[in-house]
């Protein structure tokens, strides 16, 4: 089946919440690891269906940000996404604290529980309104970029199509292309600045409400970095500067 042929239906949040609550409650009351594992398999199927609907809507919105139907669907998921995250975290906590943890680890792996631990560090019900605002700001920026119309050489292009001119072997054509793209960004500078300012304040507030000094640590958790941290990345950058850059310079010489 082609992507364009995949059927889409908006999720029913009332039914979604009902199913999450049922899965969470049954997991809490399970009498064995085997029973919890079977419920977990149901959870995988259920969340896969929910995620498929969300991804279909978001991708189709990205393909054509002027499509009013999928714009409304995107706005809907911007709102309900953090609520779904709340149920995901609640279920994850039940699984994480399971008395049958050893059995579950043998079935779904230890990494799953490491990811649950990270997810718990990146979420709390109290930041749902901030997460909804963050989603809306991100969608607003994406639309601003996707709907760019740039007059160039007698035609009108979007940012993606301008890249072929920006990388042209013709130096003068490249210069004109970069000038045209720069002019577009200058025309929307105020809006981009507003989005950026609100996003920084939003994410900083999320981090502080979760007990972090700034968004950096929270950002690593949000990216689900389960095998390295900020200090390790800093060390990697340091090694690149000390060893790889001099080596690359010698190659160029």
Which residue stretches match the model-derived regions?
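A well-structured
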Residues: 1-253
């Amino acid at each position: 089946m082609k992507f364009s042929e995949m059927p889409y239906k908006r999720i029913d949040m009332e039914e979604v919440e009902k199913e999450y609550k049922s899965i969470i409650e049954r997991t809490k009351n399970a009498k064995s690891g085997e029973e919890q594992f079977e419920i977990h398999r149901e959870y995988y199927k259920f969340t896969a269906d929910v995620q498929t609907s969300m991804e279909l809507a978001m991708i189709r919105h990205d393909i054509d940000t002027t499509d009013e139907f999928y714009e409304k669907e995107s706005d809907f998921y911007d709102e309900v996404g953090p609520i779904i995250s709340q149920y995901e975290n609640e279920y994850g906590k039940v699984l994480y604290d399971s008395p049958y943890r050893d059995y579950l680890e043998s079935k779904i792996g230890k990494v799953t529980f490491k990811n649950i631990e990270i997810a718990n560090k990146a979420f709390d019900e109290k930041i749902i309104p901030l997460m909804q605002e963050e989603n809306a700001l991100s969608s607003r920026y994406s639309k601003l970029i996707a709907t760019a119309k740039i007059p160039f050489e007698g035609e009108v292009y979007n940012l993606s199509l301008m890249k072929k001119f920006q990388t042209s072997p013709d130096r003068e054509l490249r210069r004109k292309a970069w000038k045209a793209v720069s002019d577009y960004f200058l025309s929307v500078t105020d809006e981009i600045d507003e989005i950026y300012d609100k996003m920084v304040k939003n994410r900083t507030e999320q981090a502080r409400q979760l007990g972090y000094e700034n968004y950096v640590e929270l950002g690593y958790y949000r990216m689900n970095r389960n095998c390295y941290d900020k200090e390790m990345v800093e060390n990697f950058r340091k090694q690149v500067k000390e060893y790889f850059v001099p080596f690359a310079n010698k190659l160029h010489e």
